[in-house]
Amino acid sequence: MGKSLYQKLYDAHVVYEAENETPLLYIDRHLVHEVTSPQAFDGLRAHGRTVRQPGKTFATMDHNVSTQTKDINACGDMARIQMQELMKNCAEFGVQLYDLNHPYQGIVHVIGPEQGMILPGMTIVCGDSHTATHGAFGALAFGIGTSEIEHVLATQTLKQGRAKTMKVDMTGHASPGITAKDIVLAIISKIGSAGGTGHVVEFSGSAIRALSMEGRMTLCNMAIEMGAKAGLVAPDDTTYAYLQNRQFAPKGDDWHQAVMYWDTLKSDDDARFDKVVTLDAQDIAPQVTWGTNPGQVIAVNQVIPSPESFSDPVERNSAAKALAYMDLQPGIRLTDVTIDKVFIGSCTNSRIEDLRAAAAVARGRRVAAGVQAIVVPGSGPVKAQAEAEGLDRIFLDAGFEWRLPGCSMCLAMNNDSLNPGERCASTSNRNFEGRQGRGGRTHLVSPAMAAAAAVAGRFADIRELN
C-alpha cells in the first residue's frame, strides 16, 4: 500500500522507535520567539546543557512588540523582560536572533519562509500553534509546548506519535476575488472547528495547486483552526520558484539534488487516508465569521443562522452563546453590521500579496468616519517591499495606519487591542472571546474584505464594490 505525504515525512525523521514507546523524531528547524522560550532556556541553564545544533534554531521578537516604535519598553514591563530574556538567551547559547533592530525582524511564521529556512521534507517546530503555516512547503510543521522546546534545544529531537490522516480535495477553480482565506474558512465551515482533531490534513486539488505560496501558507496556517495537528501541501514548481535563491535555500548542484528529492514528496496514488473531504472551489463566496470560533462562518451574502438551525445540541448552545457575545441577531445580514476597527496583518495575512490585495481596494477610497484601520506588515522585508511599491502611500492616503512589523492585534498581548464592545474586521486566524481584547468582537475575513469593510464602515461584498 502506498504512503501519504505525511507518512513519508514522518517515517523519514524517525531516529528511534521501540515497542510500546512513542517514536523519537529528528527536528530540522526550530523557530523561537520571546513568549514561550524563556523557561526552556532556563531549563538548559539549570542542567548545564547547551543548544545541540544552534545553527538550526532561529529566534525573533514578534508577539509582544510595539508596532509604533522600536522601543523595547513600549509594551510594558512583562514584554520588555521577555524580549530582554530572549536577547540574553540567544547571545549565551549562540542562537541567531532577529531582534527589533534587525532588518529581517518580523512574525516568526513570516520570516522563516521568506528567508528560505523552511524547505520541503523538513520537520519544523515552534512554541506556537500556527507553526502549521510551514506545511505549505511540504514540511511537517507543528506547534509545541515549552517543555518540548527545551527538549528540542537540548537534543534536536522530539517524541511524537503518529497522527491520523485527512485529505481535503478542493476541485474546480475559485471565482475572481476568492482568496485562500475564503477557501480555508469554507473548509472549516464544512468540517467544523474540531473536524480535523487528531489528524494531519493534506490539501490537494486544482484549486490548491492554483494558489501561490503565500496563499498556501494562509491555508496551512488555519489548519489548526479545524483542530488539525498540521496542514500540508505537496511541493511543486510553485514551491521551487518561491524558494530559489533565498538565503537558506540550497545553491548550485545542491539545489538540483534537493529538487530531485522534493519531487518525491507527494502522496502515492494508492495512499489511504482516514478521512477524505471534497469541496468545489466554484461554490465559495467571500467568507465572514459571525461567531466565536472559525467554524461559525457564512458567505457575506448569507444571513446569520438561528441557533435552532443546528441539530447538534452542543452546536446549538455554542451558537446561542456566540450570538449573545457578538451582539448579533439571527436572520440579519452581515452587510448590515457596522464595525469599529479593521486589522490587516498576522501570520495568516500579512505578506506582500495580502497587502497588495488590500491596497487594491483602498486605492482612491477613504476609511469610513469613526473606523480605525491599521495595516501591519509581517516582516521588515515585507514592509520594505510594500513601500517600494507605494502601497504604504495608498493606505496612508486612504486613512489607514501603516505600522511596524509584529503580531499586533491578532492577540491582546501588546498595545494593539480592542476595547470592550468594539467590533473588528480582522485578517487574523482566531475569533475567540477576548482574543483581540477583553469584550472585543472579532470577525475573520480576507485582506480585501477587511479593506472593503474599512471604507464602507460595515461588512461589504468585494464583488459588489463600485
Curated annotation (Swiss-Prot):
E.C. numbers: 4.2.1.33
**How the cofactor binds, per note?**
Binds 1 [4Fe-4S] cluster per subunit.
> Could you tell me the Gene Ontology terms of the biological process aspect for this record?
L-leucine biosynthetic process
InterPro entries given in the database record? 3-IsopropMal_deHydase_lsu, Acnase/IPM_dHydase_lsu_aba_1/3, Acoase/IPM_deHydtase_lsu_aba, Aconitase_4Fe-4S_BS, Aconitase_4Fe-4S_dom, IPM_dehydratase_rel_enz, IPMI_cat
Q: Pfam families given for it?
A: Aconitase (PF00330)
Tell me the GO molecular function terms: 3-isopropylmalate dehydratase activity; 4 iron, 4 sulfur cluster binding; metal ion binding
Alphabetized PROSITE patterns for the sequence: ACONITASE_1, ACONITASE_2
Listed A to Z, the keywords are: 4Fe-4S, Amino-acid biosynthesis, Branched-chain amino acid biosynthesis, Iron, Iron-sulfur, Leucine biosynthesis, Lyase, Metal-binding
Cofactor names from the entry are: [4Fe-4S] cluster
The pathway noted for it is: Amino-acid biosynthesis; L-leucine biosynthesis; L-leucine from 3-methyl-2-oxobutanoate: step 2/4
EC class (word): lyase
User: Is Metal-binding a UniProt keyword of this protein?
Assistant: yes
Q: Which reaction does it catalyse?
A: (2R,3S)-3-isopropylmalate = (2S)-2-isopropylmalate
Give binding positions for [4Fe-4S] cluster.
347, 407, 410
Q: According to its UniProt entry, what is the function of this protein?
A: Catalyzes the isomerization between 2-isopropylmalate and 3-isopropylmalate, via the formation of 2-isopropylmaleate.
- NCBIfam families linked to this entry: leuC, PRK05478.1, PRK12466.1
Which family does the record claim for this protein? Belongs to the aconitase/IPM isomerase family. LeuC type 1 subfamily.
Q: How does it assemble?
A: Heterodimer of LeuC and LeuD.
- This chain belongs to the protein called 3-isopropylmalate dehydratase large subunit
Taxon lineage: Bacteria, Pseudomonadati, Pseudomonadota, Gammaproteobacteria, Enterobacterales
